[in-house]
């Protein structure tokens, strides 16, 4: 197939069975590799869906200024898509944005609006959103994507990954394990799959320190999972179980995923791997394989200064009081025998 632009290559990502990672003969784990989307993440889908639907229906015009509060994957996806559509795009970011993401956004030609004041939760999300609202008041042509409240967010996953999974997976999944942040991904996929597989259990994976499911706010470093405010889209009663994963556990699971499956994924992927390990630990051995479905949202290259940096992991481990720092899984220790660093 020949695409007319890079935008048309979004989606149709592979579904891969993880045969080496979990060591359970009575479990089949399948991961949809959203990290293979052209701008590097699952956020390519809502970015395309929301912008194209807005252009078609008139909510976005040829001279619109698209704005979003995002320091990461959605901002990058919007920068790529808006650039190709001839639209101006500005990402409202905060001091926690990684140098890599900032460089990527600038390469795509995005405008950068950075806030510096912390909000009442000690983070920056509310401050960023207030800056977006200020820009909307000041600029008549400004359009806010608003991923936390926009139903087009979850619709993009309902018509996107969920439809593809139904075509890719021959047998129903017993358990869906997905990270939660805006909640668009988990709701869009679960709502579509449950129509076909009504007995499927949905496990949401949240970050320790996130307030999504009633925990107190704490410092956390990995983006892409959890939030410091509850999104308007979140329907807690549609999620059967929630597992909280801390930064250290997510990072070490990322390293196991890379070592055993060769999948170089971002921090939230490690969180879902760690959550699946907990699900399997709590599941008795059975003659019928437990079929688990998950999704890896983004690429590991954006986490070279965190998840895959040994000094960063040691700092996180010390904060968590890991007893044996000398036994930390370094990047070098993950390289298979016979392969040079």
Swiss-Prot record:
<feature type="modified residue" description="N6-(pyridoxal phosphate)lysine">
    <location>
        <position position="43"/>
    </location>
</feature>
<dbReference type="Pfam" id="PF00291">
    <property type="entry name" value="PALP"/>
</dbReference>
<keyword id="KW-0808">Transferase</keyword>
<dbReference type="GO" id="GO:0016765">
    <property type="term" value="F:transferase activity, transferring alkyl or aryl (other than methyl) groups"/>
</dbReference>
<feature type="binding site">
    <location>
        <begin position="181"/>
        <end position="185"/>
    </location>
    <ligand>
        <name>pyridoxal 5'-phosphate</name>
    </ligand>
</feature>
<protein>
    <recommendedName>
        <fullName>N-(2-amino-2-carboxyethyl)-L-glutamate synthase</fullName>
        <ecNumber>2.5.1.140</ecNumber>
    </recommendedName>
</protein>
<dbReference type="InterPro" id="IPR001216">
    <property type="entry name" value="P-phosphate_BS"/>
</dbReference>
<feature type="binding site">
    <location>
        <position position="268"/>
    </location>
    <ligand>
        <name>pyridoxal 5'-phosphate</name>
    </ligand>
</feature>
<comment type="similarity">
    <text>Belongs to the cysteine synthase/cystathionine beta-synthase family. SbnA subfamily.</text>
</comment>
<dbReference type="InterPro" id="IPR036052">
    <property type="entry name" value="TrpB-like_PALP_sf"/>
</dbReference>
<comment type="pathway">
    <text>Siderophore biosynthesis.</text>
</comment>
<dbReference type="InterPro" id="IPR023927">
    <property type="entry name" value="SbnA"/>
</dbReference>
<dbReference type="GO" id="GO:0006535">
    <property type="term" value="P:cysteine biosynthetic process from serine"/>
</dbReference>
<dbReference type="InterPro" id="IPR050214">
    <property type="entry name" value="Cys_Synth/Cystath_Beta-Synth"/>
</dbReference>
<comment type="subunit">
    <text>Homodimer.</text>
</comment>
<dbReference type="InterPro" id="IPR001926">
    <property type="entry name" value="TrpB-like_PALP"/>
</dbReference>
<feature type="binding site">
    <location>
        <position position="73"/>
    </location>
    <ligand>
        <name>pyridoxal 5'-phosphate</name>
    </ligand>
</feature>
<keyword id="KW-0663">Pyridoxal phosphate</keyword>
<comment type="function">
    <text>Catalyzes the synthesis of N-((2S)-2-amino-2-carboxyethyl)-L-glutamate (ACEGA) from O-phospho-L-serine and L-glutamate.</text>
</comment>
